[in-house]
Structure formats: structure tokens, C-alpha cells
Amino acid sequence: MQHNKILIRQLGLQPYEPVSQAMHEFTDARDEDTLDEIWLVEHHPVFTQGQAGKAEHVLVPGDIPVIQSDRGGQVTYHGPGQQVMYVLLDLKRRKLGVRELVTLLEQTVVNTLAEYSIESHPRADAPGVYVGERKICSLGLRIRKGCSFHGLALNIAMDLTPFLRINPCGYAGMEMTQMRQWQPAASPETVAPRLVANLLALLNHPPHEYLPRD
């Protein structure tokens, strides 16, 4: 069995909770023979609270549900037009520490945005990726049994106004941005394959397979 191979699932537009549950079940059931996976998904509008999330950072959720998550970090928003990439990796197999994985995911986004002539950077004091002072990508992980789950959320072509109902990632007044501000044609469909390709490159080009859409 080719343990190094990574399977890539394209889940389309999905509610948050069933995907989160599936991710937990996958991680709990893993053993040393389980192949790593990358899940690409867009979510219906939802606020997710991180494990250390404080209720005061949810200002006026209104009609958007607030769901507790066990990832790191504070509250964020997911919605259509944002590409979420969940990384279900055996860190020992990949010879990665948690901090290295965070850096690798941030660099994946920086490299992807550079292909679209968008200059971006991570910040030491606030995980994620930024264009100037504005946040374009949120990041939150959980490690269980030496395996990662959760991942990143890149704003591409979405309605950003729900971010005004929260303090994104616990920072009051944090301004958000998205790829469409610089690249009007950008879409999750076109950006997702570039994200995956850049992540695989940083993982030293392991064999991979896109699974057929369900």
C-alpha cells in the first residue's frame, strides 16, 4: 500500500456540522494504514467558535447560526465563495510538527495568491494570511492521535458583511478582504486546484488522487 498517497475529496457546498462530524469520525477511525486526505468544501453561512472562543467576540449573529468547534482559534465566518481546505494528515508520516504544518499552510496560501499577483504575508501575532493589514485567510487546526484535522478558509468571492457581526479571530475591528478585490474572475472552482497543487509541492510532491465527486 502506498502510504504516502493523498486522496483529495471535492465536497461542493455543504452545511458545516455534517462535514465536521465526518472529519472527526475519519480521524477517530484512522490507523497507520489510513491514507491522508484533503477535503475541499464551501459551507452554508455559519459562525464557528474555536476551542478557546469567547462569547463576547460574537457581536450580533442575527440569523446566522453559531456552532462550537474544537479547532484552535476564536470565532470566524464561513460562507459560499470561501474555499475551505481541511487537511487530514498523519504528522508523523509527513515528518511535520504542528507549528511546521501551520507555517506550511500559510505558505500554501501565500504562494497561491502570488500566482494571482496578490502579495500577502503571515503574521507572527495572529495566525492566518494577510494582504496589507486585512485578513484574507483564516487558519485553525486540531491534532488528535498525531493527526491533523480542520484547516484553512480562503476568502475568494463572497459576501464579507457577516464578518462585521463578529470580532474575526478575536480581534475587534479586524478588516477582512478577498481575492475578488484584485482578481474579479477568481472563484473557488479555479482557485481550489491551485491551493492543492501548492500544498502538495510543499509536502514534496506526494502521489495524489482526486476522488470522483459524490
Swiss-Prot record:
Stored InterPro entries? aa-tRNA-synth_II/BPL/LPL, BPL_LPL_catalytic, Octanoyltransferase, Octanoyltransferase_CS
Boundaries of each BPL/LPL catalytic domain copy?
32-207
Site feature (Lowers pKa of active site Cys) residues: K135
Major place of residence: cytoplasm
Looking at the keywords, is Acyltransferase present? yes
A Pfam family annotated for this UniProt entry: LplA-B_cat
GO annotation, cellular component aspect: cytoplasm
Q: List each coiled-coil range.
A: none
**Keyword list, A-Z:** Acyltransferase, Cytoplasm, Transferase
Keyword Cytoplasm among UniProt keywords: yes
Reaction(s) catalysed by this chain's protein: octanoyl-[ACP] + L-lysyl-[protein] = N(6)-octanoyl-L-lysyl-[protein] + holo-[ACP] + H(+)
Biological process according to GO:
protein modification process
What is the enzyme's main class? Answer: transferase
Enzyme Commission code = 2.3.1.181
Q: Pathway listed for it?
A: Protein modification; protein lipoylation via endogenous pathway; protein N(6)-(lipoyl)lysine from octanoyl-[acyl-carrier-protein]: step 1/2
GO molecular function list: lipoyl(octanoyl) transferase activity
UniProt-annotated location(s): Cytoplasm
Q: What CDD domains does the record point to? A: LipB
- The active site of this protein is located at C169 (acyl-thioester intermediate)
Q: What does this protein do?
A: Catalyzes the transfer of endogenously produced octanoic acid from octanoyl-acyl-carrier-protein onto the lipoyl domains of lipoate-dependent enzymes. Lipoyl-ACP can also act as a substrate although octanoyl-ACP is likely to be the physiological substrate.
Q: What else is known?
A: In the reaction, the free carboxyl group of octanoic acid is attached via an amide linkage to the epsilon-amino group of a specific lysine residue of lipoyl domains of lipoate-dependent enzymes.
Q: Which family does it belong to?
A: Belongs to the LipB family.
- The protein depicted here goes by the name Octanoyltransferase
Q: Which organism is it from?
A: Klebsiella pneumoniae subsp. pneumoniae (strain ATCC 700721 / MGH 78578)
